[in-house]
């Protein structure tokens, strides 16, 4: 593994670590402190301000028009639309279902990459993807608890749409990611996302029969009437700074160095990370499935990387 590949793997591990931490945090935010639309708007706005500030401190980078279109459209699909689906999914179902469905992301990416950018599906690559899915599913299933969400069927459907749109983003922005800095890409991604996230959120509200379809919703978030806003503000700060700015900085950084399928395999780290953190803070116990799941996910990433570097891959 050369230095660029190592940097790509390290970046995507960091990104999926914070993404794994963000699932229970988002679940708490959209069920207690924000509406899904309010959550997405403030998340987009915060990330936009930070990325444009960072861009102002860096040398200006010119983006070709066709590449800018790919970045903007891909970003709107991969962030504004995908994460809105995710926020609504977590408002209707439990994080465990969401984590289970997220393990299907590498399959979606592999199939889309084969269909649209002619990335071959080799036997070794398929085996690697399946090993990673097995590792993540092992831990999710072993940690299954009773109880249901508000509407699990609807939540699961929205989670599937979230993973599909995220997979589309990984595939269509793969080549462009190698041409421009992550900050340049993300400043346009989040500016476009901030513009469309509320209209798309209103569309979701109207379709789901939830929330208020006007700007007054942003002025009436549950957080504003809480006796102490500190916890909700701290959680939102974590989502904006770590799960959005840091996480989405490292994704294009990684995609410039390793294939989209390899990037997607690391999605299976998210439930592993969530479980490790729960154990560390005393909310869970260490059982045999957790280290086994972690080893399987890392083995999966190694196999897919080896397969991608073969001449016929």
Predicted features and spans:
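C-terminal-most transmembrane helix of multi-pass membrane proteins
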Residues: 1, 44, 141-142, 232-234, ...
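Glycine-/small-residue-enriched transmembrane alpha-helix faces in small-molecule transporters
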Residues: 1-42, 149-175, 195-199, 313
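Juxtamembrane helix-entry segments on the extracytoplasmic side of multipass membrane proteins
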Residues: 4-8, 33-37, 41, 63-69, ...
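Specific transmembrane alpha-helical segments of multi-pass solute transporters/efflux pumps
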Residues: 18, 22-23, 52-102, 138, ...
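Hydrophobic/aromatic residues within transmembrane alpha-helices
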Residues: 29, 39, 43, 89, ...
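Helix-helix packing/entry segments at the starts of transmembrane helices
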Residues: 41-42, 79, 83, 97-104, ...
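Transmembrane alpha-helical segments that form core, pore/gating elements
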Residues: 51, 109-110, 148-209, 213-217, ...
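Hydrophobic transmembrane alpha-helices of multi-pass small-molecule transport proteins
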Residues: 51-52, 72, 112, 121-143, ...
